[in-house]
Design a protein with these regions (language model features):
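Glutamate identity and glutamate-enriched acidic tracts
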Residues: 17, 33, 46-49, 66, ...
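Residue-level signal for secondary-structure boundary sites
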Residues: 14-16, 60-62, 96
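Short, surface-exposed ligand-recognition loops at beta-strand->loop->(often short) alpha-helix junctions
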Residues: 9-22
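Intrinsically disordered, low-complexity segments enriched in polar/charged residues with Gly/Pro
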Residues: 14-17, 27-29, 39-41
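An amphipathic, aromatic/His-enriched active-site/gating alpha helix that lines ligand/cofactor pockets
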Residues: 24-25, 30-37, 55-89
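Glycine-rich beta-strand-turn "strand-cap" elements at beta-sheet edges
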Residues: 2, 7-11, 37-47, 73-97
Length: 97
């Protein structure tokens, strides 16, 4: 499996809105993409930080997701709560237990 990891700095007082946007817009948009397995979001409201993990079956599924333009559409919806542009990285995911 593979994961796209997106690190975000959230504006002060906007974490609840951030989580709602992820839950109500981002995750539903990902469900229709090939190879989508799930989404995990970690939040630290005190620090205004959030890390999102989008899990895919394969590297090819991640490439197809990037090419679809969905990421850019979702970031546009999230712009009102972001303090700065997100940082994206890709990893191979190994589940040990």
């Amino acid at each position: 499996m593979h994961a796209r990891v997106v690190t975000n700095q959230i504006q002060p007082g906007k974490m609840d809105e951030w989580v709602a946007l992820i839950r109500d817009s981002v995750v539903p948009s990902l469900r229709d993409e090939a190879g989508f397995k799930g989404f995990v979001v970690l939040t630290n409201a005190e620090a205004g930080e959030s890390i999102g993990y989008s899990i895919r079956d394969s590297a090819d599924d991640m490439v197809a997701s990037e090419a679809s333009g969905n990421y850019q559409q979702q970031i546009a919806k999230l712009g009102s709560v972001l303090a700065m542009p997100p940082v994206r990285e890709a990893y191979e995911l190994t589940v040990l237990d």
